[in-house]
Amino acid sequence: MVTALQRTPVAAVVGRQLLRSGTAVGANYREALRSRSKSEYAAKMNIGLMELEESSYWLELLDEGRISTGAEVKALHAEANELSAIFVSMIRKAGLGANSAGKF
């Protein structure tokens, strides 16, 4: 999706940021799965949640700034929202309490 963006300086910056935050979600999730403690798990999952929120922000900028307004942007934004809900649920189910999820 990032490679399909317009060839403008603004699209390049937003695309680079989206690529960085989007790939960080998966990296932090994998690190959380290999964590050594609940607190380390919570920390990595919360970082992943923050990266999802950042990805949502960049997707909103793509849409609202008319850099890319296709159905793919809307679908990715919906997926980021779904993943955020899943991350919050996983943190809560790990016994870290509702207050741990979403608190940075």
Model-based region annotation:
Residues 1-104:
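Short, C-terminally biased terminal segments at protein or domain edges
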